[in-house]
């Protein structure tokens, strides 16, 4: 459990990403529903000084030492936003892992890109050799998913992306709390 109140994987889950919720989470959801305000912005006079999204963003920033954190509706939306911000569009190839949540692939397709599978390693994440083997002249980005609480081997991936001028987008939705050489995953990419 994080000091600010959100829970990482504990005895209630078999692995990160499979957490179950209990009485604490039910109470928190009901408190939000009782305000009648489900949106991040506005309705200041009605929210009874509850700023759940803003507080969660601050908590994530503090925990990961990130400069910014912005809550969106889902991991799918987060990946779609990152691809759009990276300028991924029609015909751009994006290297993705074959072991991932379907939203990884859907987000690339939504952006107009073409997902290209690359091999994963024992961490269940992409690795540099798998990425390199899948590269073509149309490759514009690598969408790296840190799976099941594991951090990918980032140094060789970062080096490859720099050498090939590839945008690196990290999906750390299944690995909040995972670190690589003292840095939170999700903070290495674009």
Give the residues covered by each predicted segment.
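Solvent-exposed polar/charged
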Residues: 31, 62, 133, 159, ...
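Residues at secondary-structure transition points
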Residues: 47-51, 73, 99, 126, ...
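Residue-level recognition of oxygen-bearing side chains
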Residues: 77, 153-156, 190
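Active-site phosphate/pyrophosphate- and oxyanion-stabilizing loops and adjacent acidic/basic residues
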Residues: 58, 155, 182-183
């Amino acid at each position: 459990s994080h000091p600010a109140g959100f829970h990482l994987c504990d005895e209630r889950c078999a692995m990160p990403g499979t957490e179950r919720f209990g009485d604490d989470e039910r109470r928190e959801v009901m408190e939000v529903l009782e305000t009648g305000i489900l949106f991040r912005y506005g309705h200041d006079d009605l929210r009874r000084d509850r700023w759940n999204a803003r507080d969660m963003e601050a908590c994530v920033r503090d925990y990961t030492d990130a400069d910014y954190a912005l809550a969106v509706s889902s991991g799918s939306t987060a990946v779609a936003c990152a691809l759009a911000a990276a300028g991924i569009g029609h015909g751009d190839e994006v290297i993705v892992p074959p072991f991932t949540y379907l939203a990884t692939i859907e987000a690339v397709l939504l952006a107009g890109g073409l997902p290209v599978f690359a091999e994963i390693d024992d961490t269940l994440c992409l690795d540099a050799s798998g990425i390199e083997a899948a590269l073509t002249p149309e490759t514009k980005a690598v969408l790296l998913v840190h799976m099941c609480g594991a951090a990918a081997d980032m140094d060789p991936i970062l080096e490859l992306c720099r050498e090939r001028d590839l945008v690196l987008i990290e999906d750390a939705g299944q690995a909040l709390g995972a670190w690589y050489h003292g840095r939170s995953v999700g903070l290495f990419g674009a």
